[in-house]
UniProtKB/Swiss-Prot annotation:
GO molecular function, one term: NAD binding
Record-given protein name: L-aspartate dehydrogenase
Reaction(s) this enzyme catalyzes, per UniProt: L-aspartate + NADP(+) + H2O = oxaloacetate + NH4(+) + NADPH + H(+); L-aspartate + NAD(+) + H2O = oxaloacetate + NH4(+) + NADH + H(+)
One of the Pfam families matching this protein, by short name: NAD_binding_3
HAMAP family: NadX (MF_01265)
Organism: Psychrobacter cryohalolentis (strain ATCC BAA-1226 / DSM 17306 / VKM B-2378 / K5)
Superkingdom of source: Bacteria
Length: 263
């Protein structure tokens, strides 16, 4: 048996919890003060619900962040300081260079690993492998239904009422995209970190009222040749802003801690 801790308990964490195999136990949930009592009632007494890393009673084999950038920045350093390996969904937080350096330094000092989760896309392993030989161009296009962009910085850029065809509303670097759209563009930061970096990865964000699926399209060129990946992914039913595959990538990491053969 292995124990895991979740940072955050929103729609993604609930989906991962629901799908955990019997040999992986959710022992602790770290949440905000305002939601703690509600989540305690929901989970019962078998799972510890805490609001600070200082309240941790049992040290888990792995912590997985599914809280968003604010939760990650609040708790990650203390978690790594307790020598707990950490999986991260909110990769957009790496646009904060000071925070990213602090994460790496703390993990190294305490002999633990930080796992950057692939999230909503495939091909991250190929892009990272190609980066060792040299990549010249990496372009990511994120296409989603307008409803998936609502409530984000896109509200200032999109005329939702008059949107009738696919519209590119943002073009910039992965650093800019992940900072402006933290809930929607963590995947852009993941691709960038795996490849040519946050400042040299081009990102296009598109609102398309005809879509039923979220479309993630990656194009890369380098010494290895050319790579092109297009994925049509369903969002979680509980949260249209969250990719179901992102939840499954977190589930995969949880399952790996009890597997001898690693993929």
């Amino acid at each position: 048996m292995k124990n895991v801790m979740f940072i955050g308990y929103g729609s993604m964490a609930r989906k991962v919890h629901e799908m955990l195999p019997k040999n992986i136990i959710l022992s602790t949930v770290l949440v905000s003060t305002r939601s703690a009592e509600i989540i305690k009632t929901e989970l019962g007494e078998s799972i510890a619900v805490i609001t600070s890393v200082d309240d941790l009673i049992e040290t888990p084999d792995l912590a997985v962040e599914m809280s968003g950038q604010d939760g990650l920045k609040e708790h990650a350093i203390k978690i790594l300081g307790k020598s707990i390996p950490l999986g991260i969904i909110s990769v957009g937080a790496f646009t904060d260079e000071k925070f990213a350096i602090s994460l790496a330094d703390t993990a190294e000092a305490n002999g633990v690993e930080i796992h950057i989760l692939a999230g909503a896309v495939a091909g991250i392993d190929g892009i990272h492998a190609a980066s060792f030989a040299g990549l010249s161009d990496v372009v990511y296009q994120g296409k989603k239904h307008p409803s998936s962009w609502k409530g984000s910085h896109a509200d200032r850029l999109i005329d939702y009422d008059n949107l009738v065809e696919p519209t590119v509303f943002f073009t910039g670097t992965a650093r800019e995209a992940a900072a402006l759209f933290p809930d929607n563009s963590n995947v852009a930061a993941t691709i960038a970190i795996a490849g040519v970096g946050l400042d040299d990865t081009t990102v296009e964000l598109i609102a398309d009222p005809t879509l039923e699926y979220n479309i993630h399209h990656i194009m890369a060129k380098g010494v290895f040749g050319k790579l092109e990946i297009s994925m049509a992914g369903l969002p979680l039913v509980e949260n249209p802003k969250t990719s179901s595959l992102a939840a499954f990538s977190a589930l995969r990491l949880c399952c790996q801690i009890d597997q001898v053969i690693q993929m």
